[in-house]
Every structure is written in structure tokens, then in C-alpha cells.
Amino acid sequence: MTDSFPRQAARTMGFTLGAPRSFRLSLDGETVIFLRSRGGTDPVTCLWALDVTTGDERLIADPAEVGKAGAEDDPVEKARRERVRERAGGIVAFATDAACTIAAFAVGGTVYLADLRQGGAAVDSAAGGSAVGGSAVGGGSIGGSTVGGSGVRELPTVRPAADPRPDPTGAHVAYVSEGALRVHEIATGTDRVLADPEGADGISFGLAEFIAAEEMDRNRGYWWAPDGSAILTSRVDETPVQFWHIADPSNPAAEPRSVRYPSAGTPNAVVSMFVAALTGDFIEVSWDAAALPYLVTASWEASIGHPLLVVASRDQRDMRILAVDPATGVTSLVRADTDPSWVDIVTGVPAGLPDGQVVWTADIGGAKRVVAGFEAEHAAGTAAVLTPDSINVREVLGTDGDAVLFTASAEDPASITVWTAGPAALERLSPADGVYSAQQAAGTLLLVSRTLADSAASVRVLRPGSAGEPRAEVARIGSLAETP
């Protein structure tokens, strides 16, 4: 019997199962790490790697192989899944070190570490994700107790754990447990608290509050220093937020579940920031939080050298970039953007260029445009405008050398195309029609395309041709999603 569309859509979770997502392109452009389940009806998301040169895919970690395929999430991880609208089980997110040699992820409140250099079995995606020789989870080890002799090991952390992130050097993994921000040293197994709410109800470190995750596209609450010596972390106090009580219509005998929900016009969570050094120093970051209570985002990039905060007023008419002195917590104004209606939040900024310039977006000449400059230039209003008013910037995707990668709309607002802007020129990297996203590193371009010609997104890896030839496809990440 042929499936009806509603049945097929339900069985495939809206045709999302088997579709690759959450890509991470290594800095050398040689490897792509991503998430995907084994098939169009498989609800367990796995961790994969693509070798760009050979085009081979490797299955790095399958929660079924570590006995966590159907593990229940703790309330924090469940809330994180809800924020990103993730319905499948397994691995919802991962993070890597700067060199993409290790990846950390949490399943069922347990932290796992995967060796991306040698782990994984070759997989034929066209054959439905079956392993081609070897185990389904890779070989090799990073040390400590491994899972099933594979390159994926369970870290002996406090549980339940959420949002594990390796430091850029790959020496430590930070994570959040019971509202405390903790750090695990990989080599020794030492695990300790870096920021502790000390049992206070409604207070947590290192997690994004409800408004940040739902309205600002910020799903994290801490950022490693580039050298791994400290963490910039948020402290969220939800005690002012009102409770809502949600009943289960399918089980009227159950008590309603109480959750804190900041509905419009009611008190929000109070967010503050701290620099927590691995040496034990704990320094509060100071700014006018009464006038600018929203923490929109933060960053700590090696090229800039110190943390940057983006904060905004509650009416969203005033948004500012603040530079943070990590030694004292003192902030200084980098730039301020105001609007009588509101200032748009653009994902991906601030970003840093190798020479220390700060990339931002601003409304200039009736369009959202990319601007870049040193902090003094932003403060003086002399930052360079990199894009014309004929395109409207949607998102900054990152930087590659001195070029800024971003998405924008030109004549057709229904099309979102990929562009790069730098000292040399402005260039569109995708076709004009469709919705695209991308990552770029060392000249390698990972292009995600969605068009009316295909029900599934295509994921291609392209590299520049020789002697001025156009970019050519060198690899492709397969989709195992069903066709409607």
C-alpha cells in the first residue's frame, strides 16, 4: 500500500530524517563534520565526517552503538532540543576544537568525546548508510575508557551534562551540570567546577536563557578563550520570571508542569557575565545592564584578542558592541547602533578578520550592509562599508582570510544567495535563484542549496579552479531523506 503524504510526513518527521545538517568545515578545508541519521525513517542522529579530497564519508559516532539510542534527556537538554526544534533522538549538537581533531557531544546526560583523526568506518551513503568494513563507530582511542573499543569514549563527568565544548587547543572539555559550569581535563580526567550557583534555585551558569534561545538565535551561554585559559560565561537568574503551569491533556490525573515563562511585559531573567579562568580567578564583567539588559551574543576570537559582547535595550532600539578587558571585567564601547523602531539582530556578527578588524552589519542607505574596521574606526563611525545598497545582508557566515562570507538578497527577496566581500572584490558564490548557506575555509567552499527543483537540500564541496577557472565540485554529502 502506498503511503499517504500525511503518513509519510509523520513517519519521516517532516522529511528531516536522513538529511545532513550542522556542518563544521575544518580550518584547512579538508574535512567536514556533520550530523545525519542512517536513513529516512531512522530517528537517531549520528556524527559523520567527510574527507573532502577522497569524497569518502565516515560514521564517527552512532548513539545506538554506545547504548544511548533511546536515552531520555535531562530537563536542560530537553529544553535545548525544544529551542532548536529538534524532534529526532541521538546527537542534537556537537562542538570541536579549533583544529577539528576531537568532537564532544552529549546523549542522555552523558558526555562523549570522539577522535576525528582516526575514528570512523567508511560508509556508502547511497546504500542507506551501511558501514563498509570495520565497526559502525570508529577505531582508535584518545585514552581512558572507550566504548566498544571504538574511537568514541565516554568522559567520566558529573551527570546530567549538557552542551559540552572542547577548548580551542583540545586539552579540556567544558559542560554544564545542574546549573554549574564545569571543566574536564582530557589527559588526566580531572573534573572540577568553574562557576557554581551553589544550589540556588533559578540560577545557572553557561546556559542561554529562554529569550536568547527563542528570540535572539543564541543557543549557548559560554565561550572559550582562544588559548583555552579561561571561559566567558553567562550567569542567568530566573527568579524574577513568572511561572506558567502546563497540563497534559492526555493525562488529566498528572499534576501540571511548572515552567518559568517571560511573557510580554513581565520580568525577564537577569543576565550577567563573568570571566572564569582555569587558575580560579572569577571576574564579573561590568556594563549598564539596567539600560541594556539583553545579552544578544558574545565572542572571543584570537584575531581580536579579547571578548566582545553585544547588548541591547529591552525595546531593541539601542544595540551596542562592548569590548571586555578579561583581566578586570571593565568594558568599553566599540560602536552603538540605534533606530526609532528597532535594531535587527543579524546572526554571525561580530566576527573578526585576521588583522583584528571587527565585522558588523549596519543599516546604511536603505539596506543592511557589511562593515569592517578596527575598534577605533567603529567608534569614530569610519568603518569601511564592504557591500553595496543593491543587496540586503541576511547573515554573516564567517570569514576566510580577509574575505567575509555572508548571505544576502538582491532583486528577489525570496532568494537568499551566498556572497563574499573583501579588499579585492564582491562576488556571488551561489546561483541567483534559491536559498543557500555556506562555510568557507582555506578556499574550500561548502555550499548548501535549496531550490524548487529538488525536495531535498544538496550539499556540495567546491574548490577554486586553476588559472582563473570557476570553482568545481570535488565532493558531495549525500542525503538519505525520503522523497515526498
Question: What do the PLM-derived regions correspond to, one by one?
Answer:
Residues 22, 435, 439-484:
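Serine-hydrolase catalytic core recognition
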Residues 1-426, 434:
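Beta-propeller folds
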